[in-house]
A protein has these predicted regions:
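Conserved PLP-binding catalytic core of the aspartate aminotransferase-like
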Residues: 323-324, 328, 337-376, 393
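PLP-dependent enzyme catalytic core of the Aspartate aminotransferase-like
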Residues: 362-416
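Short, Lys/Arg-enriched N-terminal segments with co-localized hydrophobic residues
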Residues: 3-13
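PLP-dependent aminotransferase class I/II
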Residues: 252-336, 342-346
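N-terminal small-domain helix-loop-helix segment of the aminotransferase-like
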Residues: 15-119, 126, 310
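Conserved core of the PLP fold type I
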Residues: 79, 83-214, 231-232, 237-244, ...
Length: 416
């Protein structure tokens, strides 16, 4: 196992390397290879002007090398020259159970509660088709993860958006009265909860989840709880699994997880659900079996096993320290040096969500013009409109600290 991280004064001495600037060009990386390439995938940043390198801050993956136990595990399996049919191993399930016990103090999780999903959105799609019909409304919070919007559109369902609201301290909060009203008025029986929330970065407290789940219980709503960001926690915040809130929450929730956000494995595809209720589990299995979609890749299985080893815990702890440093720097700089930009300090994820309405109106700019200014100097940030904020910009800060400071130097000198 890797050595322990030590802290000397305010300088972090880390076992793992989060400072090397990794060249991902030509290595199957949408975040860099798609820029300026005319790729039809959402709205892609344009190439920067001459003299500026690209700092990828749009696609939600990381610009760090993953924990070494993952490639080691993949290579060990790949060296055996047969890749035929197989079943998930005991080690796969035991790794998941152990990870949730050690990270989130989950007890009572058994192999029968775990099911493979070919991506978190694949799970969401299966659940939507299993428990709703085309034309039905589904409750979500806005700002909203763009992937949810696409799944609902592609399956013929309708998003009923309950806006998150900022309190007097600028913290995003659920509006419980609004949620309850929308559910009742639209006869909604399925809700999607993003915990931690993307793009706003909220790590919901137990009390907040208790209030939300009480509303879902009152209205007999099944809940899809997307907890893919649950390992990415900033500044000491703690994730509360939705299913841990109560026995009722445990039985009405389809929770979905993956090592992909935590360990930068999105290209390998491999998520899993946790379902305790037999009725929900059977309906999900039936819908999934109809498409033959959820077939696990053997290398994805071994990637998860490698990720969820002991070294993975330390790697994630160090990652969260580095991401906290990045987030704190960016948040403080915006608050102190850039007028007219609203930003809430994320508690989880590595995304920063900017609201730029005041700035744009004060400077007679459209949001598209502001975004293009960033792209022109290599700050490849992302439009916020697909997340239901027409004045929004989403920034991925999972890059080395030196690139975070470089990005904001460019923003200060050339953009804002």
């Amino acid at each position: 196992m890797a050595g322990r991280r030590i802290i000397e004064s305010e300088i972090l001495v880390m076992t793992y390397d989060f400072e090397t600037i990794m060249d991902r060009r030509g290595k199957d990386a949408l975040a860099v290879d798609a820029i300026g390439a005319g790729v039809e995938w959402a709205v892609v940043p344009t190439k920067p002007k001459d003299g500026f390198s690209v700092i990828p801050m749009w696609v939600a993956d990381m610009n760090f090398a993953t924990v070494p136990t993952i490639p080691k595990e993949i290579i060990k399996r790949a060296e055996h020259p047969a890749y035929g049919y197989y079943l998930p191993t005991d080690e796969y399930f035991e790794s998941i159970i152990r990870w949730h016990k050690e990270r989130n103090n989950v007890s009572g999780l058994e192999r029968k509660n775990i099911g493979y999903e070919n991506g978190v959105l694949g799970c969401v799609s299966t659940a939507i088709k299993a428990f709703t019909t085309p034309g039905e409304k589904i409750l979500l919070h806005s700002p909203t993860y763009i992937g949810f919007t696409h799944v609902l559109e592609n399956t013929g369902r309708v998003a009923e958006l309950s806006p998150l609201k900022k309190d007097e301290n600028g913290v995003w909060r659920m509006d419980y009265a609004d949620m309850n009203r929308r559910i009742k008025e639209n006869h909604i029986h399925l809700a999607i909860l993003c915990s931690p929330h993307n793009p706003c970065g909220r790590v919901w407290t137990r009390e907040e989840l208790e209030q939300a789940m009480a509303i879902f219980r009152e209205n007999q709503c099944i809940v899809i709880s997307d907890e893919i960001w649950s390992d990415i926690l900033l500044n000491g915040n703690k994730h509360i699994p939705t299913q841990s809130i109560s026995e009722d929450a445990k039985n009405r929730t389809i929770a979905v997880y993956a090592p992909s956000k935590t360990f930068n494995l999105a290209g390998l595809i491999g998520s899993y659900h946790i379902i305790y209720n037999n009725y929900l589990k059977d309906r999900m299995k039936r819908e999934s079996d109809m498409t033959h979609y959820n077939s696990m890749n053997v290398l994805s299985m071994h990637a998860l096993i490698g990720a969820y080893k002991d070294e993975g815990h330390q790697w994630v702890d160090e990652l969260c320290e580095m991401l906290s440093k990045n987030i704190n720097y960016a948040y403080d700089l915006i608050q102190n040096e850039i007028e007219g930009i609203e930003v809430s300090k994320p508690e989880g994820t590595y995304m920063l969500f900017l609201h730029c309405e005041e700035y744009c109106k004060n400077h007679d700019l459209t949001i598209d013009e502001l975004i293009q200014r960033g792209w022109d100097v290599g700050v490849a940030w992302q439009q916020g409109a697909p997340f239901h904020d027409e004045w929004g910009i989403r920034m991925n800060l999972a890059v080395p600290y030196s690139l975070v400071t470089e990005a904001f130097d460019r923003l200060k000198h050339y953009v804002f």
